[in-house]
Amino acid sequence: MALTPADWQMIAKAALPNMGKYLEWRSLWREAAQAQARANAAALTPEQRDWTFDLLTGQRAYSAKPDKRYQWKVLPQGMSNSPTMCQLYVQKALLPVREQFPSLILLLYMDDILLCHKDLTMLQKAYPFLLKTLSQWGLQIATEKVQISDTGQFLGSVVSPDKIVPQKVEIRRDHLHTLNDFQKLLGDINWLRPFLKIPSAELRPLFSILEGDPHISSPRTLTLAANQALQKVEKALQNAQLQRIEDSQPFSLCVFKTAQLPTAVLWQNGPLLWIHPNVSPAKIIDWYPDAIAQLALKGLKAAITHFGQSPYLLIVPYTAAQVQTLAAASNDWAVLVTSFSGKIDNHYPKHPILQFAQNQSVVFPQITVRNPLKNGIVVYTDGSKTGIGAYVANGKVVSKQYNENSPQVVECLVVLEVLKTFLKPLNIVSDSYYVVNAVNLLEVAGVIKPSSRVANIFQQIQLVLLSRRSPVYITHVRAHSGLPGPMALGNDLADKATKVVAAALSSPVEAARNFHNNFHVTAETLRSRFSLTRKEARDIVTQCQSCCEFLPVPHVGINPRGIRPLQVWQMDVTHVSSFGKLQYLHVSIDTCSGIMFASPLTGEKASHVIQHCLEAWSAWGKPRLLKTDNGPAYTSQKFQQFCRQMDVTHLTGLPYNPQGQGIVERAHRTLKAYLIKQKRGTFEETVPRAPRVSVSLALFTLNFLNIDAHGHTAAERHCSEPDRPNEMVKWKNVLDNKWYGPDPILIRSRGAICVFPQNEDNPFWVPERLTRKIQTDQGNTNVPRLGDVQGVNNKERAALGDNVDISTPNDGDV
């Protein structure tokens, strides 16, 4: 019994532990597997053997044509035969004919076969051999469809000895009603475009009908411009023809500067194939030199596809010096120059057909230059989302209001105004890459995508550039760089002009709304900062689309708070999945001042908690008491030892009771809300969207911008002594039944007062009934002000504000 390859694999695996004999076993397995494969192949017929993929034998007889090494068994679902299998089968049947007549041109497309040769005698010999060979493969040719002539039809085109004429297409207008109807018609026209010399720009009104409602049954109408384009197609079809290529003669590729988009043709004493670019450009501004290079690359590929060789000559509308300049500035031209091994020229053939293609006047920049102009005036431009545009020339600032809310669009309008105002040599400095790149491309731009909102502005700038006589140089400068020098100063003047004008034109409500759109602060902050009414401030917050879903809800319960900063802190970890690896957000908050600190870290282990504590304490100070939940990182020995070393008292709340850390839990929600709101804000262009940067911006707003009812921010409450009532009281200690004071009041509550004895480290809470209020006068805390004192007659009664003395009350007075 012969061993199968699977058996030999089992033997090889069993021998793996013995590494010394591994190579020997591998060689034996290979030889046995090949022997078994040869034995199996011997039982196959020659036809079956040709279609078998022999992996183990190592033979490479069919490696040049990989498709022949596979046995096709599965047909596409729903088909009775496979077009691919049909092609492969007929190609294999035609192989003996190709080998017998190597000079014969034999083309196959599905069930159509074309035989071509210069000598009719050779065709007469090849045709009977073809019939005989196909009959051996079970294939028959319908003799009634055979055409033997110097002029024949193949794939709908008429092939004559010197030219190829496309099939005649009847264009009917009576059934053009829906998107589907126009799609079919334009598909036929696009298929015939290699026969037509109509530039793409002339057919644009026709192809623009396909835009709009995407449903195939959506209505469409034939516009006047589209009807005129359709008439041009009908006229071109009447005389459409291509020349037959002469294999012994070279051919060239010509790229013409037609309007808006270039047109190319493979040429050999006549058009061999017309090549057109895509009708709809991928970019808003299609730079004409790049479009020529892209079409030239497309033409080189078409030459290889149709004729099997590259043209010997490439003709473009540029001189040799201009080609070198474009190759250094454009990636497409660099690829074209390095990939084409032939000659590049700019002298077109003299032929009447080619006279149509010279109507694009400017194909190389003449007005926009690449180097600064020494004799040109320098103008700095800037635009803002408030619609204010400004430019600075010779120290003079000019501002203008536009009805736009995009900084790029406003700056485009400012540049247009500058080009119209300054007609002499001009240097423009802008802080928008978008505007600088657009202006550099517009002079020789082909098609400007009409769907863009700035298309109309770009067209106006292009017309102004084409009508100018003096050169223009435009460059970019980074805004808010803080660098010294006149360029940074000029840009800063233009930038400040947009803000000053916007502030002067806007009302306090509008200014508050813009400030809120940037930072999404609270209504109390807006009310204090911009002197608004409570209703106006609340309306701004409630009308904000980013803040309306985060409005506070009433809460119940209370957490113990510190009466001074750095007394009691709460700390916890929350998750922000959008931060990726830094999704573990550690948050700490001071329960007295409300100062908050957060660190996006890669985990929530004890080491990460310690890292967060050190970062927070280095920024805002070390608390006396730190309260957390019962998480494993907080209850670990490592963190407990860290707290002891740092002399921080660590407390944990009840297990599974997050309300014990309600202050930091609320801080989680507040911080996440600001991360979401400020992500939708106006800092997208200036602030990078990194996790730490986003957290820092939110903390800056919460700690330094939001204010309380007394007009203080969290940072101010944390870094300064809190406002205390200017009151001194004497108070009785119920433990020793003695009176103390006078001491200052820290906090008042219902029925109780918190006093801070001057000789104690901690404050005390005392019932309000056990206190006696003493009003101070110029720092004298021992002399209270009383309107009437025992022992003083009516004539000597003290007036309000007089200084009198009072003895310390005894126990009976209380």
From Swiss-Prot:
This is Intracisternal A-particle Pol-related polyprotein. Reverse transcriptase/ribonuclease HThe reverse transcriptase is an error-prone enzyme that lacks a proof-reading function. High mutations rate is a direct consequence of this characteristic. RT also displays frequent template switching leading to high recombination rate. Recombination mostly occurs between homologous regions of the two copackaged RNA genomes. If these two RNA molecules derive from different viral strains, reverse transcription will give rise to highly recombinated proviral DNAs. InterPro entries: DNA/RNA_pol_sf (IPR043502), Integrase-like_N (IPR017856), Integrase_C_dom_sf_retrovir (IPR036862), Integrase_C_retrovir (IPR001037), Integrase_cat-core (IPR001584), Integrase_Zn-bd_dom_N (IPR003308), Retrov_capsid_N (IPR008919), Rev_trsase/Diguanyl_cyclase (IPR043128). Residues 1-159 form the Reverse transcriptase domain. Residues 727-776 bind DNA. Mg(2+) 1 binds at D382, E411, D431, D495. Its EC number is 2.7.7.49, 2.7.7.7, 3.1.26.4.
